[in-house]
Structures are given as C-alpha cells and as structure tokens.
Amino acid sequence: MVAKKIKVFLQWAVALAVGFCIVNLLCMGYERLVGWIETPNGPSPAHWNPGTILVHGTEGYGITKIDQNGYINPDGTLEDSHILCMGSSHTQGKELPSGKNYTALLNTHFAAGEGSLAAYNIACDGNFLPSLIKHFPAAVEAFPNASAITIEISNTDISVEELEYALEQAEYVQDQTAQLGLVSKLKMLIKEYFPLLNLIKSKLETAASAAPAGAEAVSQHAAALLREALELIRSQYDGEIIFIYHQQTGIAQDGTIVFDEDRLFDVFAQACQDNGIRLLDMRPVFVEYYNLHQELPYGFANTRPGNGHLNKLGHRLIAEALIPYLEEAMA
C-alpha cells in the first residue's frame, strides 16, 4: 500500500516537473525578461544584463537585444554629436518590434550612415521624474558629447519626499557594477532561464497592488522644490533639454479622449519656461490624431484601452514632434 502511494506520488511529481518544463520553454518565446543590474550612481537607476535577449509578449510583442551597456539600442557606434534619450519603460519600447521606438526613429532620421547611432536610449523601467532628476548629472557625465537631451515623463504630480530624494543627486561612478555577488548572479539566472516563475511573480504582485490614495491639495513646498529641481538640471547642462510630456489616456462614455489630472503641471510648465527648457506636451497631438483616426497612442493593460505603454503610433508621433526641435541642435 505504501509502495503504491509512493509510486503515485512520484508519477505526479514527474508529470508536474515535465509540465513545468514545457510551459517554461513556451514562456521563453512569450515573456522572458532578463537580469536587472542596479546602478545607484549610474546614468539611470538600473540597466538590463548586457548582451542578452529580452522577449516581452504580455503587452504587444517585442524581441529585443540588449546592448553592451545594458540598454535597448541598435548595434552601432555612437556618433560624437548625439541625442541622449532618458525616460521610463515607455521610452524603452520593449513592447514593440525592433526599430519602432521613437529613439530608433530619431536615429534613422539623424544618423550619418549605417552602423552609426545619433540617438542613444538610456531609459529603464520605473524611471520617473524623481529618479530622472536624481540621475541627470550622472547621465551628463557619462555622455559628455550629447548635443541634446530628451526626457520622457508622464506625470509631474510628485510628493515633497520624492522631490527631496531627487535633489540628492547621484554622483557618477563608472563601471560600478562590474562585480556582482553570488546571490545577484543567481537571481539573474533564475529570471532569465525560468521565465514562468517570473511571470507568476509579476501577476501576483499586480493582483496584490493597492489602489492609489486620494489626491490632496497641491503643496507649495512641493511646487518650490520642483522649481528648484528644474533650475538645478538647467545649471548642469548647457545644451537643448526637451521634456516629452504625455499622459496615459482613457475613453469617456461619449467617446472622447480623457487624461488624468496632474496638479503640478502648470508649475512644471512655468519652471521649464523660466529656465529655458523646452516642454513638448504631446496631449494635443494625441487628441488631434484620435479625433481624426479614432486610434489611441497607447496599448491595452488589463483589458482597458489606452492604459498600456506607448504603442507604435505613440512612438511615431513623438519622433515626428521632436525632429523639428532637434534639427538645430544636431546641425
């Protein structure tokens, strides 16, 4: 009797193991993120494991090769005069086929020839306005020949605590992540070769995430710190700085496109103007295109249209809007 139970248990264990291996193998072609290396003193808070292949199929579909620096860029040599592109996962464009994000489109327009890179993408997941400000001087030092810097943001409504964090800017340290510990290497291997585990973990975290707290009145302290932050980054770079501002969209019951409230946007816009920083507000462009063609610049997230990342249309519209302003900087 005991032997029979052991046999049944082993059969189930083998079946589960085989099933896991099959599904894990299928995930290799559906959703395979790669190792994530933190760079607290780098041009961005983190980057991907250099030289790996990232597969992202849970929203759109993209197969992306990570470059030698851990970012999403085509193979090629960076030109002496180039555009440095900072931002979040929207700018990365890992949901798209290769060559369809706006930095690749800028490169196609400005590059001197095949094998040259005129635009370089250092965006990373979760790299929003506070961390963009924090890592700005490190980015300038890491890429001293940048003729222009674009910074993609989707929200300016940030707290005093986030702004205080941002103003404690990172001091650039080159090659700070050359040596990874054993635990970090093990985590990276699990993430890259067991994508099913990573997918399950991601879904559980999404399900457990809490709804955002209700909005409070705009803090005058936060407004003052935001103005200080923009004045600071202006002092750290003499070239063209362009903030690309966009907001994820929704569709109202009457079919019109709507955006969430951003209470600090007016303060941010005035601070950009006061410091000679260009602000490219993509909302009117997106609304005009939607009204003409009924097509959104964002994908789906959790079945809600317009709540996902920038899609091919969104990236193309951003590239088209940027090019006239970058022509002079790249001349």
Description of each model-found segment:
Residues H82-L84, H90-L182:
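Conserved SGNH/GDSL esterase-like catalytic core that processes O-acyl groups on lipids
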Residues N155-A269, M282-H293, R304:
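Serine-dependent acyl-ester chemistry module
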Residues M1-V8:
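N-terminal Lys/Arg-rich, disordered targeting/topogenic segments
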Residues Y30-G113, F286-Y289, H293-P297, A301, ...:
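Membrane/wall-proximal cationic-aromatic binding patches
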Residues L129, I133, S219, A223, ...:
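Short, amphipathic alpha-helical "lid/cap" segments that border enzyme active or binding sites
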Residues A301-A331:
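Histidine-centered active-site loop/cap adjacent to the catalytic His
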Residues Q11-M28:
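Hydrophobic membrane-insertion alpha-helices, especially the h-region
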Residues A142-A146, Y237, A329-M330:
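Glycine-rich phosphate-binding loop signature in dinucleotide/nucleotide-binding domains
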